[in-house]
Amino acid sequence: MGKWEHKNIEYVLPEEIEKRSFAIIAAELAERGVVLPAEQDMITRRVIHTSADFDYAQTMTYSENAVEIAKNLIKNGADIVTDTNMALAGINKKVLASFGGEAHCYMADAEVAAMAKERRTTRAAVSMELASKREKPVIFAVGNAPTAMIQIYEMMQESNWRPAFVIGVPVGFVNVEAAKELILQTEVPYIINRGRKGGSNVAAAICNALLYELRDHSCNK
């Protein structure tokens, strides 16, 4: 087997890679005839950027004024709770902290593991229950466990509690689509990807897209 030829390699400066990536995304969306709503544009593009999957241009679903609501929550110091440590690691916590918010994941807590074992349920479900008791408004960023979204829905059905916002992008085959549809039929503000696709990286990308838009707007004032 011969050596790889380098003639098709595009040499890009490190600081230009992201800019070049978004230019490619813009060009491919135009080729496909896809025009994203202005409010949703940068969030969906960042999801495509993190996944290299243009299907998201068709399946990302936003409740009315979702982006404005989410950004206002962040500006007012809302916290973000994730269902995986991977999503937690991917969120830009420095930018979030600049608005007074914190990011949390309870999945590795001993208390959560014990409660889940006792109840014969998932740690993700217990994590959402604990997060619902936080005093501050919480943006729930679910990128892995449909049981987290099912738990959020069930808590809404059993009480007057409502989540401030739901980012629902769990990935997989079992109960994933049904769990997303549960939240879609509620009146809570949400950003959800219909279908089986999603993931912790997608959940983090959505959070970061919101954070970066707020940061950039603040810097341009």
Language model features: what each stretch is:
Residues R20-E28, R46, I69-L73, G90, ...:
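Alpha-helical scaffold segments in soluble metabolic enzymes
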Residues G2-S21, N160-F165, C207-K221:
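Conserved, well-structured core segments that form the ligand-binding/active-site neighborhood
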Residues G2-D79:
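Electropositive, gly/pro-rich neighborhoods at or near active sites that engage anionic ligands
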Residues T84-E158, P163-A164, G172:
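Conserved mixed alpha/beta catalytic, RNA-binding, or beta-rich assembly cores of soluble enzyme
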Residues P14-F22, L36-Q40, T44, S63, ...:
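Generic structural signal for well-ordered, non-membrane alpha-helical segments
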Residues A164, V174-K221:
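C-terminal functional extensions of proteins
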Residues D83, I167-G168, I206:
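Buried hydrophobic positions in well-ordered alpha/beta secondary-structure cores of metabolic enzymes
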